[in-house]
């Protein structure tokens, strides 16, 4: 098995078939909807809030609302009242089952539900998937996070409509340091490994540092990528604004950090400051244009044409130089 990550890979261009990158279609389908780009902001308190979710839904982007200190029922009511889709996160504890029961009782069916726990290859996830499929069969269920083909196979067999791949590769995740487990440093290889057995969409979660990493994720089997740090340092980001030496930053912390949990227990995340680097609309537009450029370099016109290109594995501490044809 090859071991590499985003900075070890470059994709090889093919003959261009378009006159302008604007001719390339960067959209992707997930469930019953098509979205403008294969990018979803991480479902974290310092990345998304209700205002961002509403804006994204109204403008053709996918979102997943976080599950912390949130009334999921009220959120679903509000989104449906605005005439946009609802996409929520759940855990696997009793209050999450209670939330499902209350949604059913009120006739509220979120279009997307993400089962969001750190180690998603678990019997607790199997039970929650079964409960959702029994009580909210119309909802599209995303389950994670996982890191192995065995986990992807199990989650799909248990009924998940998509899986989320990535354990600890994110900027504020310290799982690999705290536990010795995870995909930090080889997230792209893990994605490739998992995609070989997947029959349903994969969301690659974590480790994205540059816009080009989106195209690399698509090449190795992702349908969509979940991005945290690059979308945490925006003017609209919910994290607290902090001034350091005259420069403005946004607070960004992991979902398993003590900052998020409010207690120092089972901590696998940390807090950092992200420089404020612009507005959400401009960042997403730039991402779309860069994905369109990637499609043109791939010699294609649609997003999945990127999967047809060859790639080079660059020399690095985790890989050997190699040309994959």
UniProtKB/Swiss-Prot annotation:
GO terms for biological process: purine nucleotide metabolic process. It is an enzyme of class 1 (oxidoreductase). Keywords: NADP, Oxidoreductase. InterPro entries: Aldolase_TIM, GMP_reductase, GuaC_type_2, IMP_DH/GMP_Rdtase_CS, IMP_DH_GMPRt. The active site is at 173 (thioimidate intermediate). NADP(+) binds at residues 202-225. Transmembrane segments: none annotated. It catalyses: IMP + NH4(+) + NADP(+) = GMP + NADPH + 2 H(+). GO terms for cellular component: cytosol; GMP reductase complex. The keyword RNA-binding does not apply. GO terms for molecular function: GMP reductase activity. Its EC number is 1.7.1.7. PANTHER family: GMP REDUCTASE. Catalyzes the irreversible NADPH-dependent deamination of GMP to IMP. It functions in the conversion of nucleobase, nucleoside and nucleotide derivatives of G to A nucleotides, and in maintaining the intracellular balance of A and G nucleotides. Belongs to the IMPDH/GMPR family. GuaC type 2 subfamily. This is GMP reductase. The gene is guaC.
């Amino acid at each position: 098995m090859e071991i590499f990550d985003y900075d070890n890979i470059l994709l090889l261009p093919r003959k261009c078939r378009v006159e302008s990158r604007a001719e390339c279609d960067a959209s992707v389908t997930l469930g019953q909807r098509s979205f403008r780009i294969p990018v979803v902001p991480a479902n974290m308190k310092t990345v998304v809030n209700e205002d961002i979710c509403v804006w994204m839904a109204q403008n053709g982007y996918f979102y997943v609302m976080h599950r912390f200190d949130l009334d999921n029922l009220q959120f679903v009511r509000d989104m449906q009242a605005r005439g946009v889709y609802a996409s929520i996160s759940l855990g696997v504890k009793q209050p999450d089952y209670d939330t499902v029961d209350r949604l059913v009782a009120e006739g509220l069916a979120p279009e997307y539900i993400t089962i969001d726990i750190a180690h998603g290859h678990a019997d607790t996830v199997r039970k929650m998937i079964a409960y959702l499929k029994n009580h909210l069969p119309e909802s599209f269920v995303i389950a994670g996070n996982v890191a192995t083909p065995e986990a992807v196979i199990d989650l799909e067999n248990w009924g998940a409509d998509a899986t989320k791949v990535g354990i600890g590769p994110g900027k504020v995740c310290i799982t690999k340091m705290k536990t010795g487990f995870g995909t930090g440093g080889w997230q792209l290889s893990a994605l490739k490994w998992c995609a070989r057995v997947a029959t349903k969409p994969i969301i690659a979660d974590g480790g994205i540092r540059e816009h080009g990493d989106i195209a690399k994720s698509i090449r190795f089997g992702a349908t969509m990528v979940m991005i945290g740090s690059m979308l945490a340092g925006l003017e609209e980001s919910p994290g607290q604004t902090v001034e350091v030496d005259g420069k403005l930053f946004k607070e960004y912390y992991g979902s398993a950090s003590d900052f998020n949990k409010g207690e120092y227990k089972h901590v696998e995340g940390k807090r950092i400051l992200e420089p404020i680097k612009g507005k959400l609309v401009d960042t997403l537009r730039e991402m779309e244009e860069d994905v369109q450029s990637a499609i043109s370099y791939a010699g294609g016109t649609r997003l999945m044409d990127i999967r047809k290109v060859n790639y080079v594995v660059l020399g690095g501490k985790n890989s050997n130089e190699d040309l994959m044809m």
